[in-house]
Amino acid sequence: MDGQELLRDKNKSAFKLNGLPHVYWLNLDADTHRRDYMESQFRYWEIENHTRISGFDGRDDDVSAHLKGRIPDNVSQAELGCCMSHLKAIKHFYEETDDDYCMILEDDVNLDIVRYWNFTWRDFFGLIPYDWDCVQMTTICTCLLYTSDAADE
């Protein structure tokens, strides 16, 4: 794709994100390549209202010091770190802003899916029930996933 095609592509899809709330994105301090990746996506999609939240690395950090009560047996340290990072972003949003809502992303999100939307952010937001508290948006991989069970068949 040459520069002109890239510009036309960008201008055709970036408008779909008009009205996007402030974006908080989770990123481990050591993952500078993911930080660069996210910052380049924000530039490409013309998203200026974003804040990086330094994440907890459950593989290296002892997150149990931040928790009360018993940690479930089937939760890994990495999952706890991810959960703690999300809670840190929510806390920052709650304590540091007067905004009504925000968006929280992990640093491996791929915003290219927006080009395939047949709606805008404002269209989507207008369809959320009036009494919502939290909305989870996710993209499910449509490819065949190989798990240990699938490999055994």
Predicted regions and their residues:
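An acidic/histidine-cluster motif and surrounding catalytic segment
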Residues: 1-105, 109-148
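A short, hydrophobic C-terminal helix/tail in secreted or cell-surface proteins
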Residues: 149-153
